[in-house]
């Protein structure tokens, strides 16, 4: 896994470096904020699940600004693309502690059902490292925004990230042994998609689609504040460490995804 991470980061770096040779200006920034992780823990579209399974993320971001040239400190030719698009690169990390909430583990069910107790006692976490790019579209002029302190620049984006995930699954039920059948809710004991059980502590990697909506605020001529609401869909259902057999349990067949509300600061290097 470390070799794969190094290879992806190097490829990512040199691709940006090659693009940078065209003279576009650069921006760097830091983002952070809460991450609501939607997984096989809890009940989907349930408020307690959404609120309870919320973690935290932090990231470094880099932008290529096509409207300005760093090599001559001048504007690029005025085209629609140059004045309305930026290319964002990102290296980020998020971690979320996970547990079961919702209608299957209400106090009434916990008082009467051992299965409900087993489900509630199953907990976990996942840590995800992202590296990827997004193309941001600004409906208003980037040039006008750059020249006007106190202005706003709303945007939407779409891109792809490569993700390295490290889940942890454990139980507090009985003697706390995860591989003891009597300690685990039955549906997680069934083999699933090449694994012996519907849970796994194996690290892995996968692609994801990333889309966001947000805005910038021009703080100074060389700095912006940013707020960004992002949706990220993983091409795997093992990111959280749980994946009950999707054929037998179709309610759990959806892949994992998250929503990240991040706030950040951006500085113009050129």
Give the predicted meaning of each segment.
Residues 20-24, 65-84, 125, 141-153, ...:
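Short loop/turn motifs that connect adjacent beta-strands in outer-membrane beta-barrel proteins
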Residues 33-39, 65-67, 92-98, 161-167, ...:
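Structural signature of outer-membrane beta-barrel domains
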């Amino acid at each position: 896994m470390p070799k794969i991470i190094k290879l992806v980061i190097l490829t990512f770096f040199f691709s940006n470096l090659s693009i940078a040779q065209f003279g576009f200006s650069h921006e760097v920034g830091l983002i952070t904020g809460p991450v609501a992780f939607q997984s096989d823990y809890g009940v989907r579209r349930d408020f307690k699940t959404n609120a309870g399974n919320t973690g935290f993320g932090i990231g470094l971001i880099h932008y290529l600004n096509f409207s300005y040239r760093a090599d001559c400190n001048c504007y690029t030719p005025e085209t629609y693309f140059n004045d309305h698009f930026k290319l964002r690169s990102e290296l980020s990390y998020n971690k979320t502690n996970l547990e079961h909430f919702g209608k299957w583990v209400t106090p009434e069910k916990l008082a009467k059902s051992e299965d409900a107790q087993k489900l509630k006692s199953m907990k976990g976490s996942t840590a995800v490292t992202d590296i990827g790019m997004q193309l941001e579209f600004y409906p208003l002029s980037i040039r006008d925004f750059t020249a006007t302190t106190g202005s706003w620049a709303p945007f939407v984006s779409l891109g792809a990230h490569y993700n390295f995930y490290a889940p942890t699954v454990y139980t507090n039920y009985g003697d706390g042994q995860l591989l003891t059948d009597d300690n685990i809710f039955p549906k997680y004991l069934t083999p699933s998609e090449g694994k012996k059980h519907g849970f796994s502590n194996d690290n892995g990697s996968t692609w994801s689609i990333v889309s966001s909506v947000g805005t910038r605020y021009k703080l100074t001529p060389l700095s912006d504040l940013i707020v960004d609401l992002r949706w990220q869909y993983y091409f795997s259902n093992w990111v959280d460490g749980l994946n009950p057999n999707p054929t037998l349990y179709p309610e759990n067949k959806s892949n994992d995804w998250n929503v990240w509300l991040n706030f950040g600061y951006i500085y113009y290097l050129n």
